[in-house]
Amino acid sequence: MKLFNFKKLSMLIAGFTLVTSPALAEISLRFGYEAPRSDSQHSAAKKFNDLLMKKTKGEIKLKLFPDSTLGNAQTMISSVRGGTIDLEMSGSPNFTGLEPKLNVIDIPFIFKDREHVYKVLDGEVGQNLLKDLEKQGLKGLAFWDVGFRAFSNSKQTVTKPEHIKGLKVRTNQNPMYIEAFKLLGSNPVPMPLAELYTALETRAVDAQEHPIGIFWSSKLYEVQKYLSLTNHGYTPLIVVMNKAKFDSLLPALQTAIIEAAKEAGQFQRDLNVKNEQNIISKLRKQGVEVIEKINTEPFKTLIEEKVRKSFIEKHGDDLLKKVDALSE
């Protein structure tokens, strides 16, 4: 009888040890974002989770919350800083209130092409900008992709600045974009993405400017029939994590998170480039007039120099020079 009890006790202890072993404990991280499930951001988030589970042998997994389930971008960023959400991704303009130097990314026409974008974001300039978020309680993991921005409206074809004059244009809350659209003679109306469709449908605003991937996935083509590929700015996504949570993890897990985030970001960039022409074709089938080739020089003349000057007055010209130098 004593032998039986000893064996039983040994089995219970072994089972308890197996269940509570840190190596087998699963860490579940909440990851929120505004984009709907149909967007490449959601595809990349799933890829991020797959990579993370593989790299950590299942120790870390992501719980995904797309489509503004946990609030708009600003709400989610605050929640990540407060620790109620673990990770969040949204366009860089949403972070400029915390780190104003990020405004350099949003200066109109600052980027020559995607190659220029990647040199900046994946190099010293971009990595330093991510690091600057740490003093705000955020660990910047990687830059993902929203894309070059296009202009849509419900009034007319837009091929020159005067076509924008007087329109109520939804912009993000970034001061660079607000200033730029004021210089074009429009009336900028900052609002979250989650409110945009209804605002366009009810004509509370006449126009908006987003990369075409968002225009498609958010079904804005249902309420906007004129789209001009102005490429007036490029917007990256920034994937952030609560810094205290990140710091609490073992170094090997930290490395896995950063590696998985960067690899998923490259996956999403490639996916967006691949999808662009397909989206344009689908938009035309939905009755959207898409203008692909536009002379952007008149737009640049009105806004580029003045917005650059505003940035230099606040932050100096060193960062701007570094970005310009990488266009070669």
From Swiss-Prot:
Q: Coiled-coil region(s) at which residues?
A: none
Among Gene3D superfamilies, the record links this protein to: Bacterial extracellular solute-binding protein, family 7 (3.40.190.170)
InterPro entries registered for this protein in UniProt: DctP_fam (IPR018389), TRAP_DctP (IPR004682), TRAP_DctP_sf (IPR038404)
Keyword Signal attached: yes
Swiss-Prot/TrEMBL GO biological process terms: transmembrane transport
GO molecular function list: carbohydrate binding
Pfam families registered for this protein in UniProt:
DctP
Keywords, A to Z?
Periplasm, Signal, Transport
Q: Which residues form the signal peptide?
A: 1-25
Disulfide feature: none
Has the keyword tRNA-binding been applied to this entry? no
Q: Which GO terms describe its cellular component?
A: outer membrane-bounded periplasmic space
Compartments where found: Periplasm
Q: Which PANTHER family match?
A: 2,3-DIKETO-L-GULONATE-BINDING PERIPLASMIC PROTEIN YIAO, PTHR33376
- Record-stated family: Belongs to the bacterial solute-binding protein 7 family.
Q: What is this protein called?
A: Uncharacterized protein HI_1028
